[in-house]
Amino acid sequence: MNNDAVFLSIKKICADYTVRLEKISPANFQLIPPIGGWSYSEVYQHIFDASILSLIPMEECIHGNAVKKHTVFAVKLILFFGMFPPAKRFKVPARLALRVKKIDHEEARMWISKFRLQLDADYPLISSADPHLRTLHPRLGYLNASEWLRVIEIHLKHHLKQLKRIEKSF
């Protein structure tokens, strides 16, 4: 998938998150769902916090503050298929898990907006990034700027599925 298609996909996914947000009552937004796990608010805070944090190493690749490493084959498969392996459960890295907190609708809108603004600023620079320069992802190894963009898309899609599961449980 090329960067333009990934970028447009991310914009559509963000729009979907925004539409879904407006349909969730403030009370349900804070509740732990019947299926357990994170509340809607925690999912929103996590996914957009993680997405914003993922822009930082992407920017490092863009600006040449990265190393020449290879992306491992298993990760290339994830990037190609656009999804995490179905049987594999990824545990949130401890440093991100500690950041998860409940937020309200307005804060969720702020997180979405902050991510979209930063992505819009960074995206045009990806094409000038050296594809051989990579920064370390805590679970996937070394990624270049385009691969970071793709991982952001995959992660956003993954948590969109989680929101759908939460919705069905109420």
Which residues fall in each region the model found?
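Active-site oxyanion/phosphate-handling segment shared across diverse enzymes
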Residues: 112-131
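Long, hydrophobic N-terminal alpha-helical segment
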Residues: 3, 10-17, 21-49
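Short, helix-capping/interhelical loops that line the mouth of catalytic, cofactor-
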Residues: 1-5, 56-112, 170
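Short, well-ordered coil↔helix boundary/capping segments
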Residues: 102, 106-113, 143-146, 150-153
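Short alpha-helical hairpin
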Residues: 19-28, 87-95, 128-134
